[in-house]
Amino acid sequence: MSSTPIKHYLQFSDFTPDEYEYLLDRARILKAKFKNYETWHPLHDRTLAMIFEKNSTRTRLSFEAGIHQLGGHAVFLNTRDSQLGRGEPIEDAAQVISRMVDIIMIRTFGQDIIDRFAAHSRVPVINGLTNEYHPCQVLADVFTYIEQRGSIRGKTVAWIGDANNMAYTWIQAAERLGFTFHFSAPPGYQLDPVMVPASASGLVKVFDDPLAACQGASLVTTDVWTSMGFEAENDARKRAFKDWMVTTAMMDRAEPDALFMHCLPAHRGEEVEAAVIDGPKSVVWDEAENRLHVQKALMEYLLCGRY
């Protein structure tokens, strides 16, 4: 084993602004190669283990296709057909799995699970989603904004909806990349101060009125009202969030060239109007595709360093 410390990607705050500048540019290059059908196999014969405790379409497809396009292979594991669902300690699973593969992506529940796994892994670990953070998605969102509008530094991102893993990851991104984050949610669904780092507090503004939160925003974004694992609260959440649907009126409060994003899957008529997500300011399909390209850049960087 190399004595060089293993680099993981467990939160957005794990990387520096300089690393993000490199990664985002590298994603642009890899996307261009993909569009031009250029073969690029820096991860030839490398193996990615994908561990899913929470189901997903976009996460599995983007990582599995991504490692293949870089010349590697993917192995899919879930709790139904592995010892992970039969009580094997996380630390033991990490020790074993990381001796057989080159890189690991985990989509799970608590952040503590992935932190414990990474602490005992011999290879890089990537957060595919936890209850607390979703760094790969926000990385794709930032890349999509830059691709469409240029630098995000100094801009305003408006989040309309629950204080969930996406919201907390956007806060970390604001601190790392230098933009303002507007947040609006109904009472009872506000940000947890413990999850807002002191270094980002000056960049975060909380609004009771979602229309006011969208004022001057360059990007308006949202997510489902009921995240995975909170299904029992669905009816209560629908009642609480009924005035926090992203509407054309909210988009009209934003900058004239503002974009709309949603990490998907979306529920039209709940967290977003059909006229918004299917309208000219929506870039949700580019956003979804870009998971593929930023994650390729991420895996390449974690395994190969910089080119």
Curated annotation (Swiss-Prot):
Record EC number: 2.1.3.3
Organism superkingdom: Bacteria
Catalysis: reaction(s): carbamoyl phosphate + L-ornithine = L-citrulline + phosphate + H(+)
Subcellular compartments: Cytoplasm
One GO CC term, this protein: cytoplasm
Binding residues for carbamoyl phosphate: 56-59, 83, 107, 134-137, 263-264, 291
Entry keyword annotation includes Transcription regulation: no
Main location: cytoplasm
One Pfam family from the record: OTCace_N
Class in the EC hierarchy, top level: transferase
GO biological process entries: arginine biosynthetic process via ornithine; arginine catabolic process to ornithine; citrulline biosynthetic process
Family stated for the protein in its record: Belongs to the aspartate/ornithine carbamoyltransferase superfamily. OTCase family.
Protein name from the UniProt record: Ornithine carbamoyltransferase
Name of the gene: arcB
